[in-house]
UniProtKB/Swiss-Prot annotation:
One GO process term, biological-process aspect: translation
Protein name stated in the entry: Large ribosomal subunit protein eL42
Presence of the UniProt keyword Ribonucleoprotein in the record: yes
UniProtKB keywords: Ribonucleoprotein, Ribosomal protein
Cellular compartments per GO CC: ribonucleoprotein complex; ribosome
Family statement drawn from the similarity comment of this UniProt entry: Belongs to the eukaryotic ribosomal protein eL42 family.
Organism: Ochlerotatus triseriatus (Eastern treehole mosquito)
Record has Zinc as a keyword: no
GO molecular function: structural constituent of ribosome
Span list, region Disordered: 23-60
Composition-biased stretches (Basic residues): 23-43
Highest taxon of the lineage: Eukaryota
HAMAP family noted in UniProt: Ribosomal_L44e
Length: 104
């Protein structure tokens, strides 16, 4: 399990100094209906002939790489940094303490 704090003090390219950054997890946005690839695919699918492009079915990976989106508190400049693959990701969870009992 990976636990990342909600704020990180790191270098800002725009300010050119270390500043506090607000950390969020990157999420894929909704696909655009008018993008060139979508228009081409829709045009190809029209009419007779069934499915024209292969539908990908051989999934190999069980996890995705976590991408952190960091936004500078002062200038609102955003940067993204990838982490390693992990099954469980937590943003701003409780820190581990030595010698503490596990509570459920």
């Amino acid at each position: 399990m990976v636990n990342v704090p909600k704020q990180r003090r790191t270098y800002c390219k725009k300010c050119k100094v270390h500043r506090v950054h607000k950390v969020t997890q990157y999420k894929k946005s909704k696909e655009r209906k008018a993008s060139q690839g979508r228009r081409r695919y829709d045009r190809k699918q029209k009419g007779f002939g069934g499915q024209t492009k292969p539908i990908f079915r051989k999934k190999a990976k069980t996890t995705k790489k976590i991408v952190l989106r960091m936004e500078c508190v002062d200038c609102k400049y955003r940067k993204q940094t990838p982490l390693k693959r992990c099954k469980h990701f937590e943003l701003g969870g409780d820190k581990k303490r030595k010698g503490q009992m596990i509570q459920f």
